[in-house]
């Protein structure tokens, strides 16, 4: 017996079957660094224009987590795909370096020393801390295979950036949008600073619940409510913040609600009629009598008395009073609530909030001086009980605002702060118009979400009582407290920040005399004693002005950005602050499109938590599976919802990755001896090869469309389906005989090889944005003669949609052929089950078809037998089908007869033939294989 295996054209490639990603990826990173693959990618693009994805800066604190990995990989997929499509899309990564988390870490490190250190010394430590984690995170992001200008990132603590932020504040001042006033804002007593809306999280919290009566001793009560004795009249409120009662200034009722006077014992109590039953249940009053009804508007102006202080609490009107809970009469403390504050302004009430920064009552607060608000809660209740004005007491668990940093409950506290006024220059309406008209929101529900947030938000409190940030450039009169912040002067100071080695440290290191303009006098009192404002800017203003510091300034960018991409929480964060900052100073939004992704959760859909023990770190996955699997995970799911991750999910993706890799390896192995000179033009290819290339080209078009629409899960599924279904299970299975058994330089083999090469190059381009390491590795193993002369797969020039496509008529014919192939497989199955044949190659198939189908089948010529992977195939008229021929339910125009093929199996190609041994030198070979070996045929 001869060894005919050596005569076959078997696959040959050095591309390794085993990915060994954890070892190979670092090698690839070094290659990319050495070759400047990112620069090569950018230099090769630009034919389609520019595309700007502006990076939302992660906070320079700690190692990266799965949310960071998801976000950066998504951005990398977009940047790479846009460049490969011909857009010059450069990626400038950024870091958010100012703010409370870093300052608190440094505070902890410094301990008591911080109290005696000058501000610039503390800021230096904060800067060093941020630099440390910036470098750590940069390495971790690069390990993910993310391309970008890593050596030239934007950093919010860089002098040029700080100057831009201060300059934008000056621009707001110039337009009258910057104001300073005393208003209630979110305040964290633990961190001792104001908080923005975006810095507040809502969690369940258990609070005291009290019903309190306010004596109504106003003589006019008898006129408004005949029969009610003012000496025994009360109006009842309900609150979950007893500590705010010392600051009560009024009781609010709704002008359009009906109220009732309820007699219990000898006292009269006013509550809303719609809440009467709930109140009676809370008070545990079995016996009572409703003695009067009155509209809320009629109660306005009556003077109640504070429940434990000798001062009036007038009854006022407010539309925000509801009948959802309580009594319909609302305790009003203008120093501790936005709505209370607005009511206080309307009625001229005192905006009273006698608290220290750490939440302790000042000495002027009778009964509770020196107590924290939480210490005061039980003491207030005790006082109410003592004076006889506590009607009911309990506990309630409700959603309550907490500090995003320390996770402790926050309060509303009226303090003097700096604000961006939402109604000045029509900022709110302009922002709402831009949301509706000028921005594409992906997913679309993002539009309504941010619209509602902007529509109902208060003025933006931008001041913080901390050190680590951009200072609010303003002077305060030491004589009267008035602020001075001339816009031109503010912008001049900003330019000094830009020139200073450490940016806005200039504010802290420079003598006051060098900052105050000569001869400046207070416009309010005429004084000339000034001090610097010590508040810093909200970090959301800091990052929100990145469009001015980066998008407008960096030559590789352009305003407005094409895309902002962050987690869905940024509708209240960076998307929000960036929109207001840009609309406020430019009149237009800073972005054309906004794309959001969900949160990473565990395999059961639970939020990741250290306490639960379900946190998965990116580095763990990289160490076990490689970054490539993490990238594939990002592309495999619809990231616009919350994204699950687990070992089971990753293992499935490892299998999917292996199938894609093995397909690439097979394609590489079968083109090792192909050259540009031996390639076959598309028009001259065998029909099956043209169809396969058409399938791959259509998949390529779908993949490119999916990249354009940010639907990366469609990229993955299309690529995976191409490898598994169209190639491995169909085309490559059919092709093996032609590739292995045909003469090396035959048209049949070169046609197939050309198709495989074209398909491989489409696949490499399509997979590169997602499977970056593997695409580069595959590209490196493409035979040198066939590989484009570029240093990286990412430097491939953009091409139009490939012309390797069939017309609709040809496609329809192939769809019919595939259907016939499927039906034929069904017809063979009974013989396989019975053991009569072991493989489809053991069969002789006769297809009986009507004239139309018969013509389609015969049009494939010699490829037809190969396509069905049988040893012999005939096509005959449907009318000639024997009675026992298999009948197709799907194709009535087709019947199939299957029998065991006659003859012997060719030792070289394994096809059964009745004509073995036509050449005495090769007695076990079929005529085709004999012709190949003797050089007389293909």
Swiss-Prot record:
Look up the record and name the cofactor or cofactors this protein needs: Zn(2+)
Question: Which biological process annotations from GO are given for this protein?
Answer: isoleucyl-tRNA aminoacylation
Amino-acid positions noted as binding ATP in the UniProt annotation, renumbered to this chain: 610
The free-text note explaining how the cofactor binds reads:
Binds 1 zinc ion per subunit.
Listed binding positions for Zn(2+) are: 906, 909, 926, 929
Enzyme Commission numbers on file: 6.1.1.5
> Where on this chain is 'KMSKS' region (motif)?
607-611
Q: Which residues are the signal sequence here?
A: none
- Keyword NADP in annotation: no
| Keyword line | Aminoacyl-tRNA synthetase, ATP-binding, Cytoplasm, Ligase, Metal-binding, Nucleotide-binding, Protein biosynthesis, Zinc
Which EC main class describes this enzyme?
Answer: ligase
As for subcellular location, the record says:
Cytoplasm
Reaction it catalyzes: tRNA(Ile) + L-isoleucine + ATP = L-isoleucyl-tRNA(Ile) + AMP + diphosphate
GO cellular component terms, alphabetically, are:
cytosol
Residues the entry annotates as binding L-isoleucyl-5'-AMP: 566
- Which Pfam families does this UniProt record tie to the protein? Anticodon_1, tRNA-synt_1, zf-FPG_IleRS
Which superkingdom does the taxonomy of this entry point to? Bacteria
User: What GO terms are given for molecular function?
Assistant: aminoacyl-tRNA deacylase activity; ATP binding; isoleucine-tRNA ligase activity; tRNA binding; zinc ion binding
Q: Describe its partners and assembly state.
A: Monomer.
Q: Which NCBIfam families match?
A: ileS
Q: Record's family? A: Belongs to the class-I aminoacyl-tRNA synthetase family. IleS type 1 subfamily.
Task: Spell out the protein name for this chain.
Answer: Isoleucine--tRNA ligase
């Amino acid at each position: 017996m001869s060894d005919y295996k050596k005569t076959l054209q078997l696959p040959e490639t050095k591309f390794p079957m085993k990915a060994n990603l954890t070892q190979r990826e670092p090698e690839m990173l070094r290659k990319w660094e050495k070759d400047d693959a990112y620069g090569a990618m950018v230099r090769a693009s630009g034919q389609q224009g520019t595309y700007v994805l502006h990076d939302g800066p992660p906070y320079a604190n700690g190692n990266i987590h799965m949310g960071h990995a998801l976000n950066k990989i998504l951005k990398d997929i977009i940047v790479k795909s846009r460049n490969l499509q011909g857009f010059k899309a450069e990626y400038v990564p950024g870091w958010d370096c100012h703010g409370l988390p870093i300052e608190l870490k440094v505070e902890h490190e410094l301990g008591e020393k911080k109290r005696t250190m000058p501000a610039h010394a503390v800021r230096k430590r904060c800067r060093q801390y941020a630099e440390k984690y910036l470098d750590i995170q940069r390495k971790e992001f690069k390990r993910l295979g993310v391309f970008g200008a890593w050596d030239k990132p934007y950093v919010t603590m860089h002098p040029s950036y700080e100057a831009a932020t201060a300059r934008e504040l000056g621009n707001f001042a110039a337009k009258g949008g910057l104001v300073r006033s005393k208003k209630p804002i979110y305040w964290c007593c633990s961190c001792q600073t104001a908080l923005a809306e975006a810095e507040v999280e809502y969690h369940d919290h258990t609070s005291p619940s009290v019903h309190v009566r306010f004596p109504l001793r106003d003589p006019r009560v008898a006129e408004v409510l005949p029969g009610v004795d003012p000496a025994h009249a009360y109006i009842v409120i309900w609150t979950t913040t007893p500590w705010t009662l010392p600051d009560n200034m009024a009781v609010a009722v709704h002008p359009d609600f009906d109220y009732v006077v309820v007699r219990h014992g000898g006292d009269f109590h006013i509550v809303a009629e719609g809440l009467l039953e709930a109140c009676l249940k809370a008070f545990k009053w079995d016996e009572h009598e409703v003695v009067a009804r009155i509209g809320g508007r009629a109660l306005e102006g009556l003077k109640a008395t504070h429940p434990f202080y000798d001062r009036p609490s007038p009854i006022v009107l407010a539309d925000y009073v509801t009948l959802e809970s309580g009594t319909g009469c609302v305790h009003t403390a203008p120093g501790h609530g936005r709505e209370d504050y607005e009511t206080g302004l309307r009625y001229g009430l005192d905006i009273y909030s006698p608290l220290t920064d750490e939440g302790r009552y000042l000495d002027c607060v009778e009964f509770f001086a020196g107590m924290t608000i939480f210490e005061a809660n039980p003491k207030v209740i005790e006082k109410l009980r003592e004076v006889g004005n506590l009607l009911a007491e309990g506990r309630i668990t409700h959603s309550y605002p907490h500090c995003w940093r320390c996770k402790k409950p926050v309060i509303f506290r009226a303090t003097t702060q700096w604000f961006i006024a939402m109604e000045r220059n029509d900022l709110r309406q302009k922002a709402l118009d831009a949301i509706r008209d000028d921005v594409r929101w992906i997913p679309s529900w993002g539009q309504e979400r941010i619209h509602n947030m902007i529509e109902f938000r208060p003025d933006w409190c931008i001041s913080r009582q901390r050190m680590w940030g951009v200072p609010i450039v303003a002077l305060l009169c030491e004589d009267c407290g008035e602020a001075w912040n001339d816009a031109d002067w503010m912008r001049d100071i900003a330019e000094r920040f830009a020139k200073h080695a450490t940016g806005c440290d200039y504010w802290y290191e420079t003598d006051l005399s060098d900052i105050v303009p000569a001869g400046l006098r207070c416009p309010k009192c005429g004084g000339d004693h000034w001090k610097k404002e010590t508040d810093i800017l909200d970090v959301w203003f800091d990052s929100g002005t990145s469009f001015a510091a980066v998008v407008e300034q960096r030559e590789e960018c352009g305003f407005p950005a094409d895309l902002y991409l962050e987690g869905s929480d940024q509708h209240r964060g960076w998307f929000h602050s960036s929109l207001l900052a840009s609309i406020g100073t430019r009149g237009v939004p800073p972005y054309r499109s906004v794309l959001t992704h969900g949160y990473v959760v565990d395999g059961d859909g639970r939020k990741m938590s250290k306490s639960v023990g379900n946190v998965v770190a990116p580095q763990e996955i990289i160490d076990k599976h490689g970054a490539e699997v993490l990238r594939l995970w990002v592309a495999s799911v619809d990231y616009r919802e919350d994204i699950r991750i687990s070992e089971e999910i990753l293992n499935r993706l490892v299998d999917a990755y292996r199938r894609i890799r093995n397909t690439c390896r097979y394609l590489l192995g079968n083109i090792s001896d192909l050259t540009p000179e031996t390639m076959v033009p598309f028009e001259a290819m065998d029909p099956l090869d043209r169809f396969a290339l058409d399938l791959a080209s259509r998949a390529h078009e779908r993949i490119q469309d999916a990249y354009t629409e940010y639907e990366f899960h469609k990229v993955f599924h299309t690529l995976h389906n191409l490898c598994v279904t169209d190639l491995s299970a169909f085309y490559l299975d059919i092709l093996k005989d032609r590739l292995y058994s045909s003469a090396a330089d035959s048209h049949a083999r070169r046609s197939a090889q050309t198709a495989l090469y074209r398909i491989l190059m489409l696949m490499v381009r399509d997979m590169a944005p997602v499977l970056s390491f593997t695409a580069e590795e595959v590209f490196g193993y493409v035979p040198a003669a066939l590989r484009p002369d570029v240093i990286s797969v990412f430097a491939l020039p953009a091409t139009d949609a490939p012309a390797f496509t069939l017309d609709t008529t040809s496609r329809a014919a192939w769809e019919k052929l595939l259907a016939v192939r499927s039906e034929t497989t069904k017809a063979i199955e009974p013989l396989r089950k019975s053991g009569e044949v072991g493989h489809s190659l053991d069969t002789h198939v006769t297809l009986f078809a009507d004239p139309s189908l018969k013509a389609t089948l015969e049009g494939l010529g010699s490829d037809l037998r190969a396509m069905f992977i049988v040893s012999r195939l005939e096509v005959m008229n449907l009318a000639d089908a024997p009675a026992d021929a298999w009948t197709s339910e799907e194709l009535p125009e087709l019947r199939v007869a299957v029998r065991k093929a006659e003859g012997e199996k060719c030792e070289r190609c394994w096809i059964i033939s009745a004509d073995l041994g036509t050449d005495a030198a090769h007695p076990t070979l079929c005529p085709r294989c004999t012709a190949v070996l003797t050089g007389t045929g293909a």
